[in-house]
UniProtKB/Swiss-Prot annotation:
Record's compositionally biased regions (Basic and acidic residues): 110-124, 203-218, 236-248
UniProt protein name: Protein phosphatase 1 regulatory subunit 15A
A GO molecular function held by the record: protein phosphatase regulator activity
Similarity field: Belongs to the PPP1R15 family.
Amino acid sequence: MAPSPRPQHILLWRDAHSFHLLSPLMGFLSRAWSRLRVPEAPEPWPAETVTGADQIEADAHPAPPLVPENHPPQGEAEESGTPEEGKAAQGPCLDVQANSSPPETLGLSDDDKQGQDGPREQGRAHTAGLPILLSPGLQSADKSLGEVVAGEEGVTELAYPTSHWEGCPSEEEEDGETVKKAFRASADSPGHKSSTSVYCPGEAEHQATEEKQTENKADPPSSPSGSHSRAWEYCSKQEGEADPEPHRAGKYQLCQNAEAEEEEEAKVSSLSVSSGNAFLKAWVYRPGEDTEDDDDSDWGSAEEEGKALSSPTSPEHDFLKAWVYRPGEDTEDDDDSDWGSAEEEGKALSSPTSPEHDFLKAWVYRPGEDTEDDQDSDWGSAEKDGLAQTFATPHTSAFLKTWVCCPGEDTEDDDCEVVVPEDSEAADPDKSPSHEAQGCLPGEQTEGLVEAEHSLFQVAFYLPGEKPAPPWTAPKLPLRLQRRLTLLRTPTQDQDPETPLRARKVHFSENVTVHFLAVWAGPAQAARRGPWEQLARDRSRFARRIAQAEEKLGPYLTPAFRARAWARLGNPSLPLALEPICDHTFFPSQ
């Protein structure tokens, strides 16, 4: 491919594109100027903007074009390569000259104008024998071609970069720190992104020296984004396929450097923690301690530290140790293991403590004690602890002992079992055989006596002609409930022993005071009014009228009057006019 006649000195990205970032109007002016210069050659907007920026770089740093020693001259390159490649390589230079904006628009001074005359004349001399316009097919091929090879060290430049990070900080062999300064300046700029830096294959020679300088300086206060900006990328897929080894080597070395720095920081932070206080060591935050990948390993280390702490501490400290929160203790995955460790600690605590301490131990909440899965096992252990307390704990007050609730004492199952206590059977041995025999028939064998003793319900069958069995004894309450009842009954009997029970009756006062309640007009009074009031008035009116009618019609309804009336009706000669007309007396007007 023929080398480009463009100058090879390139500005930094922020120097070339700062005005485009600050003022979007400059891009529109550059596009308008390119249309005025070459109206018949339309180009895509990103390409024109970038080529205008490349022309600014060329104008700002005038230098004669360099011809590499390992490349043939322009004529030989055109003869050896295809004509399409030659034109595609020369296309960017033509676009740069066509789309270049005037120095007044770019804000350059008169001195810059004078300095630009030389490079422009040289560029025109190089492009004098070349065609001005390219065909659409070659233009598209030129756009797809991502780079133009030029320079003595093999520096690669992007013809049409795809993002705003198109400017690649190139360097020469004399100054080896150019790339470092460029990347630091770009990291300080607001538009910096850690994953958008571009890798240039021409800089592979200086990567080793740059990495050595970076390691020797070792800036600790550098920003986190600067460490991630060491990831390099290829300029285009073609160079990636051609030379993959330099890119991989550089990326692998940079990754190793980042890992080494992280390990050094972790060592420094771990050494800063005093090894004397092991209890506080578990609470010190170490970088990367709470990550998900290292969660299991950290929990294991925390358990080991907990075991190391448990040996030199006193029993009281061990008792408080169960209440100390350890990192990762309440996670769901380690819940079962934590519960097991808590039980072991509880067993270890039970031996050195006093009986009074054992009595209080049953009331102390242990982590994971009230979980649903371990409820049955905890309940069994609580019952055992309660039995051990009754024998080992010297209760000073019997009154307190009755009111102390032992776990599992008043459950429904235990209440049913202790309905017939052993003490009552031992105290009254004569009652137990009769009590057992009541559930059996008269001629039945006594094999089921043991079963009847433990049965919850007892049924007695009476055959005709048989003598009924004596009534069953009343069910006895457990001893603890009997004690509670006696304690509750004693205060009522000892209140006033001189006063007999018969004299205790209710006395009413002889002076009675009547208080009249005034009903105000309100919701209660309004609720009393309604249609039932009208119905009550109508009912009373109808009853009054019926009573008046019976008073008037009563003499006419007697049997004698009815017989005389029937005789008159049987004689048709009796004129109807002789009948008394008293309709007006039946229903007097009111």
